[in-house]
């Protein structure tokens, strides 16, 4: 019956109404109920024949299912729309989101709930507003769709239509008394969303309906949001309409100019100078009431520059692009505040431009500053840390010197991030745990890349001690992957993933130097993964024993010298020798096997199934268990 359900689903998906009818012909009522309620899974999506037919706009199939087979309209599934995964979507939600008006009308006329919500509290009306289908929006509202239902982030239909730029939908919702001043969870209103996206007609419409100028949760007004997003026409419109004081006006112009200096999509150094100069003139227009800047203390990452405080200082750097770039970063940090989520993006962009031009020292200064800002704001920094591994690898590959203090600094930040991500994984909801675990494991791999890079860097004894301290700090936390791998397991494993953007030019696993360094910093040599395998169990399965003999040999020697038990058994009762997949690793292992009397006794206890629990000291129980 499951195979037949697959054919039924395929026919519904492809709009083959005659094929579908033939497949269901002469079936019992219970069989039909099973076939039309069967949830098919495909590419991360879960849907029934009705849901997929509605999603794909097959009105004839939908009509057949509703009128002839009385399929329930409230069936729910999981679908993908514009890169988003929508859980708990009905056929009506799918039809509205995909713009299939005929299907929408069919479903509503057969009793579909127009206010049914998905898991994230999204309604069919919201889906239609996202897509900008005014005809569907009107039809749903005329059939009692509630325009005030917000999603789980308190984001309303008006907000999504404003952000997506659907002016006609925005106008209609406002005419239907949608609240222009409703606030999302982040404190933003529809005006914030329209201003950020640069939809000037929608901004005008919202102003006409008396949308209030308020600050969001990050202390940003729509004017500031538009300036930060380089939406000059919106800024100029709001400045002409909004009742803002002189200081707010100046800061908006400064922020707009500063943002043009370091925005990948909107970079325009001429506009940077233009708006910064306009703002400066506003500061000095009243000689009796000059608005002096409250400049930030010099910041190392910005070349210890001090922000221009008068028109003459600004004119002096007019032709100096690099100075204007730094001026832009300084101005943004002053106006937005160091804890603002958007401050770091242009810093990272400017650093990347330096890296592309082989100006690595300046790149690293900026990226370290951005990393500290993001960690101070408790932001997820796994991408930032990986970026350092990539640029350090690129430098080594190009024979550029990497400074040990820079590596130590990033390692320290990496330890902090891994500790925080371990806590996130423990305390996060089941729905988000997979993503959190991915980020956490990515951080572990990045840490290993950084350790590997440190082994290829000239270090003083003091620098090496500082690096080793960070490695020790992380080992002490005992971070584990899903498989229970420790850092040592990962260091000896050929399956440990290596990032392919510059990093794989320098880093590879198994890695003898990384293994030795981890052991020197206190890694537990006999720690086991979820399958009971020690690092020695892993390395003897390395499948390049000839071409990479030195690595295999060095790692086995390091592990054994650090106290690895060569007779330790995993959950399959296999020793490293049993797990050895090549003659070379077998020979290497045998030459290192020095069985102690203690090990022989433990193996005898296990081999003869002698009860030892609670019969010997607790410290020995674990030891016997290993054997």
From Swiss-Prot:
Annotated Zn(2+) binding lies at: 186
Q: What Gene Ontology cellular component terms go with this record?
A: Cul2-RING ubiquitin ligase complex; cytoplasm; cytosol; nucleoplasm; nucleus; ubiquitin ligase complex
Q: What does the tissue specificity note say? A: Present in adult testis (at protein level).
One GO molecular function term of this record is: death receptor binding
The source's superkingdom equals Eukaryota
User: What pathway is it annotated to?
Assistant: Protein modification; protein ubiquitination
List keywords of the entry alphabetically: ANK repeat, Apoptosis, Cytoplasm, Metal-binding, Nucleus, Repeat, TPR repeat, Ubl conjugation pathway, Zinc
Cross-referenced PROSITE patterns: ANK_REP_REGION (PS50297), ANK_REPEAT (PS50088)
How does its activity get regulated? Activity of the CRL2(FEM1B) complex toward FNIP1 is inhibited by BEX family proteins (BEX1, BEX2, BEX3 and/or BEX4) in absence of reductive stress. Mechanistically, BEX proteins act as pseudosubstrate inhibitors that associate with FEM1B via zinc in absence of reductive stress, thereby preventing association between FEM1B and FNIP1.
Cellular compartments annotated:
Cytoplasm; Nucleus
- Pfam families reported for this sequence: Ank (PF00023), Ank_2 (PF12796)
Query: Site: Cleavage. Where?
Result: 342-343
Q: Which residues bind Zn(2+) 2?
A: 186, 218
Where would I find the TPR repeats?
344-377
Q: Which residues bind Zn(2+) 1?
A: 185
Which biological processes are named by the entry's GO terms? apoptotic process; branching involved in prostate gland morphogenesis; epithelial cell maturation; epithelial cell maturation involved in prostate gland development; proteasome-mediated ubiquitin-dependent protein catabolic process; protein ubiquitination; regulation of DNA damage checkpoint; regulation of extrinsic apoptotic signaling pathway via death domain receptors
**First and last residues of every ANK repeat:** 45-74, 87-116, 120-149, 153-182, 186-215, 218-248, 483-527, 531-568
The record's annotation in InterPro entries points to:
Ankyrin_rpt, Ankyrin_rpt-contain_sf
UniProt subunit comment = Component of a CRL2 E3 ubiquitin-protein ligase complex, also named ECS (Elongin BC-CUL2/5-SOCS-box protein) complex, composed of CUL2, Elongin BC (ELOB and ELOC), RBX1 and substrate-specific adapter FEM1B. Homooligomer. Interacts with PPM1F and PHTF1. Interacts with the death domain of FAS/TNFRSF6 and TNFRSF1A. Interacts with CHEK1. Interacts with NKX3-1.
Family, per entry: Belongs to the fem-1 family.
State the protein's purpose: Substrate-recognition component of a Cul2-RING (CRL2) E3 ubiquitin-protein ligase complex of the DesCEND (destruction via C-end degrons) pathway, which recognizes a C-degron located at the extreme C terminus of target proteins, leading to their ubiquitination and degradation. The C-degron recognized by the DesCEND pathway is usually a motif of less than ten residues and can be present in full-length proteins, truncated proteins or proteolytically cleaved forms.
Protein name per UniProt? Protein fem-1 homolog B
What species is this protein from?
Answer: Rattus norvegicus
């Amino acid at each position: 019956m499951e195979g037949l359900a697959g054919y039924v689903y395929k026919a519904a998906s492809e709009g083959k109404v005659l094929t579908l009818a033939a497949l269901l012909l002469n079936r019992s009522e219970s069989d039909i109920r099973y076939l039309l309620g069967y949830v098919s899974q495909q590419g991360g999506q879960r849907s029934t024949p009705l849901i997929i037919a509605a999603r794909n706009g097959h009105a004839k199939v939908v009509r057949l299912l509703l009128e002839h087979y009385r399929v329930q309209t409230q069936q729910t599934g999981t679908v993908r729309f514009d890169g988003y995964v929508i859980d708990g979507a009905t056929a009506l939600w799918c039809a509205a989101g995909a713009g299939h008006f005929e299907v929408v009308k069919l479903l509503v006329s057969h009793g579909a709930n127009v206010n049914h919500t998905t898991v994230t509290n999204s309604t069919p009306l919201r889906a239609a507003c996202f897509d900008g289908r005014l005809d569907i929006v009107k039809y749903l509202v005329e059939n009692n769709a509630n325009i005030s239902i917000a999603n789980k982030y308190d984001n309303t239909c008006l907000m999504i239509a404003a952000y997506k730029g659907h002016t006609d939908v925005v106008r209609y919702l406002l005419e239907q008394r949608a609240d222009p001043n409703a606030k999302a969870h982040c404190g933003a209103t529809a005006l914030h969303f329209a201003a950020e996206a640069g939809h000037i007609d929608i901004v005008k419409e919202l102003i006409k309906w008396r949308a209030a100028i308020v600050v969001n949760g990050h202390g940003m007004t729509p004017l500031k949001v538009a300036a930060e997003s380089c939406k000059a026409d919106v800024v100029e419109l709001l400045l002409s309409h909004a009742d803002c004081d002189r200081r707010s006006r100046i800061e908006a112009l400064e922020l707009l100019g500063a943002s043009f200096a370091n925005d990948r999509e909107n970079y325009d150094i001429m506009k940077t100078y233009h708006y910064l100069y306009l703002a400066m003139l506003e500061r000095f227009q009243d000689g009796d009431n000059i608005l002096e800047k409250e400049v930030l203390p010099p910041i190392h990452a910005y070349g210890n520059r001090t922000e221009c405080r008068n028109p003459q200082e600004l004119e002096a750097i007019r032709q100096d692009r690099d100075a204007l770039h730094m001026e832009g970063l300084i101005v943004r940090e002053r106006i937005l505040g160091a804890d603002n989520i958007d401050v770091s993006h242009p810093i990272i962009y400017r650093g990347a431009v330096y890296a592309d031009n082989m100006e690595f020292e300046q790149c690293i200064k900026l990226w370290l500053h951005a990393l500290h800002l993001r960690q101070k704001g408790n932001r997820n920094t796994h991408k930032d840390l990986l970026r350092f591994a990539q640029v350090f690898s690129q430098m080594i590959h190009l024979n550029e010197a990497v400074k040990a203090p820079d590596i130590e600094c990033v390692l320290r930040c990496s330890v902090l991030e891994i500790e925080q991500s371990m806590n996130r994984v423990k305390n996060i909801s089941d729905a988000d745990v997979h993503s959190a675990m991915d980020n956490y494991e990515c951080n572990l791999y990045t840490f290993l890349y950084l350790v590997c890079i440190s082994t290829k860097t000239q270090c003083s004894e003091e620098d090496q001690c500082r690096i080793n301290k960070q490695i020790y700090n992380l080992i002490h936390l005992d971070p584990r992957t899903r498989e229970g791998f420790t850092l040592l397991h990962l260091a000896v494993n050929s399956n440990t993933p290596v990032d392919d953007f510059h990093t794989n030019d320098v880093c590879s696993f198994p890695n003898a130097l990384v293994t030795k360094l981890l052991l020197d910093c206190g890694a537990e040599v006999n720690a086991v993964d979820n399958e009971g395998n020690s690092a020695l169990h892993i390395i003897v399965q390395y499948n390049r024993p000839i071409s990479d003999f030195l690595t295999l040999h060095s790692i086995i020697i390091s592990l054994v010298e650090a106290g690895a038990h060569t007779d330790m058994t995993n959950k399959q009762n296999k020793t490293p020798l049993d797990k050895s997949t090549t003659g070379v690793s077998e020979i290497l292992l045998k030459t290192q096997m020095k069985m102690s009397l203690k090990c022989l006794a433990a193996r005898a206890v296990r081999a003869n199934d002698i009860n030892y629990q609670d019969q010997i000291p607790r410290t020995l129980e674990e030891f016997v268990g290993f054997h």
